[in-house]
Amino acid sequence: MAALQYLESQKNAHPELGEWYNSLADLYQKKLWHQLTLKLEQFIALSVFQAGDALIQLYNNFITDFETRINLLKLAHFAVVVSRQYPEKEAAVSYLEGVIEKLKATKESRINEPISYIETQIALFKLEQGDQKECKKILDDGKSLLDSMTDIDPSVYANFFWVSSQYHKVRQEFSEFYKNALLYLAYTSVDSLSESFKLDLAFDLSLSALLGENIYNFGELLAHPILKSLLGTNVEWLYHILQAFNHGDLVQYQELCRVHNASLSAQPALVENEKKLLEKINILCLIEIIFSRPAEDRTIPLSVIAERTKLSIEDVEHLLMKSLSVHLIEGILDQVNGTVYVSWAQPRVLGIPQIKSLRDQLDSWVDKVHTTLLSVEAETPDLVAA
């Protein structure tokens, strides 16, 4: 059989992989397709297959012999890995389109998952070719397909959100990149990612959080383990800037900008959006002021906000109107008396320092309740006894 002959020839050419080829041949002859699939997953992860056309040859000479007998989503996984070894994107797309046709020919009931997985990879190749329009079309069609399906494998979602994030990254649509990249991580084990990949993604996520419109809550990102990839690197400063934003700490932010001026200047997007960043941290400083005040003290003098943000009263009013317009807070701005009454603030993911502050407020409230109780007991003993 041609498949076995191929394995034998490869074993002779690469004796160091002899045990691998023997195992593949044994499972193939016994038609243990599930076990063969698992062994292939391990095999193609070996370093010898990470360059050249070795994977393409393995697919064409071995996997094609039984490709529709294995789990079709696993076949899609293999096909996508193989496609990345084609030096020309057009050849890779043509190969993947051929696999899709084979999937359709099986007439299996669950072919939408593997087809969606492969089409998403085609969208990425189109994006890498500079064809944003075709990439967007494939992604839109893919979303409609996913929305119509149930019980979807996490790898299909992960692949879709990853390619979507890359589309928005190319277009510098920071908020959309941020949303899709976090969704990608929701369906992906961080431990399965390489250190270099984690560092690059953590860096991109951090920048998009800072630059994205209407992103004012950094707690979710700071709590994600991928952000630890920034620590101990030459971009650790970005992690500390995120913390400063999360705490609304204008003083710390300005100090970090001074210390890491060279690194910040090397990021064109940060330089171009310097004013927006300052406005955002001032808004977050305002939010921090609101959350740090007792629940019964919802009226805040504009002078208090001006002192913390180092802004004029006029600029504070503008800051409040911006916060009201993006629905970070609800309330009434009283320009005559120079106050703002805040009736509601957008919920947020709290960090440890913010939780500690909340605990301190709760402790203070408990003390007040206890004092009130003692006062009532002392003044109306008969009523309490009754």
UniProtKB/Swiss-Prot annotation:
Ubiquitous with highest expression in flowers. Component of the 19S regulatory particle (RP/PA700) lid subcomplex of the 26S proteasome. The 26S proteasome is composed of a core protease (CP), known as the 20S proteasome, capped at one or both ends by the 19S regulatory particle (RP/PA700). The RP/PA700 complex is composed of at least 17 different subunits in two subcomplexes, the base and the lid, which form the portions proximal and distal to the 20S proteolytic core, respectively. SMART domains: PINT (SM00088). The modification N-acetylalanine is found at A2. Belongs to the proteasome subunit S11 family. PANTHER family: 26S PROTEASOME NON-ATPASE REGULATORY SUBUNIT 13, 26S PROTEASOME NON-ATPASE REGULATORY SUBUNIT 13 HOMOLOG B. Residues 174-347 form the PCI domain. It comes from Arabidopsis thaliana. Keywords: Acetylation, Proteasome. This is 26S proteasome non-ATPase regulatory subunit 13 homolog B. Acts as a regulatory subunit of the 26S proteasome which is involved in the ATP-dependent degradation of ubiquitinated proteins. PROSITE patterns: PCI (PS50250). One of its GO terms (biological process) is protein catabolic process. The gene is RPN9B. GO terms for cellular component: cytosol; nucleus; proteasome complex. Gene3D superfamilies: 1.25.40.570.
